[in-house]
């Protein structure tokens, strides 16, 4: 996965799995998994 940020939260982006934080500031769009 690729590190990304969803607002003030950190997360991970996996190609083809854009869920969890739509509209977040991440790689190619959104974070797939928000880590906290």
Curated annotation (Swiss-Prot):
Main localization is secreted
What keywords were assigned to this record?
Disulfide bond, Ion channel impairing toxin, Nematocyst, Secreted, Toxin
Q: List the disulfide bonds.
A: 6-31
Tell me the superkingdom of the source.
Answer: Eukaryota
GO CC entries? extracellular region; nematocyst
Residues in coiled coil: none
Q: Care to name a GO molecular-function term for this sequence?
A: ion channel inhibitor activity
The reply on keyword Disulfide bond is yes
Where is it localised? Secreted; Nematocyst
Say if the entry is tagged with keyword Disulfide bond. Answer: yes
Q: Which family does it belong to?
A: Belongs to the sea anemone type 3 (BDS) potassium channel toxin family.
The protein's name: Toxin Bcg III 29.21
Task: Tell me which species this is from.
Answer: Bunodosoma cangicum (Sea anemone)
